Amino acid sequence: MQVLGKEFNFNMKYFDELKRAMDFLGSHPDTIFVGQAVEYAGTAMTNTLKDVPENKKLELPVCEDLQAGITNGIALAGKIPISIYPRWNFFLLATNQVVSHLDKISLISDYKTKAIIRTGIGSIRPMHPQHQHIGDFTDAYRLMLSNIEIIRLDEPEQIFPAYEKALNRT
């Protein structure tokens, strides 16, 4: 299961709900957070993870394809990775691993895996980060992925239920 959402609207209620969802995921014994700026400051997403236990965070350098491969491996090992990509534009580099492997695991094996992928659509306010940071590829990934649900989180009240559903999915 993937949860891919809109994140950077600078609305404190939106942030608060993201943080509440990440704290909830962090309390589950089988979750591990993977990605850039999960342990160390570097993106707007970092602050939503500040109360997640340190032993549940795996900091990675900029290596999106490798990160997706690690996510696949963690899921195959029976854990629940929450793989974090700061922007959709960066997630593009992980497409091979997600489309060709994570999406197909249940079709090519007896494994029942869980994985949550979190990404964001860059905000153009209060400061425009330039075009390589504001892509929204939600619809494109919905076309490419047949076994992974894509959930776009536009409103704060959507956030916690979506992550709870992703975690509890069988």
Predicted regions span which residues?
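Thiamine diphosphate
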Residues: 1-170
